[in-house]
């Protein structure tokens, strides 16, 4: 089986060649993620919400430990999004405890997991409920000219970056996509829920990245065309662009963006040449598109351009670059980094990115 590389799974950079190279995640503290939740918690209800800090531990394992310590089934443990194992992350979990007092969760805690806050709420934490993720990245072993770095950082702060799905969506060497293709060709879905979700996500993400890569290559990823479906940064709704919408000032302000397809049932609701391009993509991957539709996936959209909120940087040491920024939920920090620097492999088996 051939190993799929970064260009196979993502696509070209938008802002030119990398300015240099660095190491990301020499230690967990080099990659810090804080979930941003815009839900006012009531302090009462049958769901116990936990603000958890974890180090070197993935979200699913943290959820299993919390569930075991609380004595509840895994289906009663919820979280908004997956976070990388090779990082220091803080995120919310909820436990469904109807008619029960707060359990002793000491058995779940340790050097790699700490519960920082507990509160009650009337509803469980839904997947995708977080508004954003805040990142603090420490890039070490830096080999690049500061003037070039500063200019590139100023540019991506002003213009955003292509909103590719990151490498980890596809598994090591693109293995999740390989398995998704195999399932599509055999017209089957894994019985295991986690595997099914992983493979479907890999297939949809690959098709989106293919479309985005085409538009990056021709320089249209950050411009609206007649027939595009436009969406605001934090909205899942979209509307069709005519000539007037293509002149909307909110496009230049990075509030409004063209979108690409997250494939599902039916044809994309885009128009004109945009629809032709998206149907041509589907025609190049017929088995994958049929499989996604048959699995009951709804056709959705994802913004092509990723605005970077609050980007700040400094150099705490001569060979260290520290970045701080906020991204919408579901977006990947390393697609920001790849527009700045090449990452030097550290021998880790997981890809160096989180969302």
From Swiss-Prot:
The chain positions of domain TRUD read 160-306
The UniProt entry, under Pfam families, shows:
TruD
Name the EC number(s): 5.4.99.27
Molecular function as annotated in GO: RNA binding; tRNA pseudouridine(13) synthase activity
What does the record give as the reaction this protein catalyses?
uridine(13) in tRNA = pseudouridine(13) in tRNA
Which PROSITE patterns does the UniProt record give?
A: TRUD (PS50984), UPF0024 (PS01268)
GO biological process per UniProt: tRNA pseudouridine synthesis
Q: What keywords are annotated for this sequence in UniProt? A: Isomerase, tRNA processing
Residues annotated as catalytic? 84
Q: Which CDD domains does UniProt cross-reference here? A: PseudoU_synth_EcTruD (cd02575)
Indicate the segments annotated as coiled coil, or none if absent. Answer: none
Cellular component terms per the entry's GO annotation: cytosol
**Role description:** Responsible for synthesis of pseudouridine from uracil-13 in transfer RNAs.
Q: Which family does it belong to?
A: Belongs to the pseudouridine synthase TruD family.
Protein name (Swiss-Prot/TrEMBL): tRNA pseudouridine synthase D
- What organism is the protein native to? Pseudomonas aeruginosa (strain LESB58)
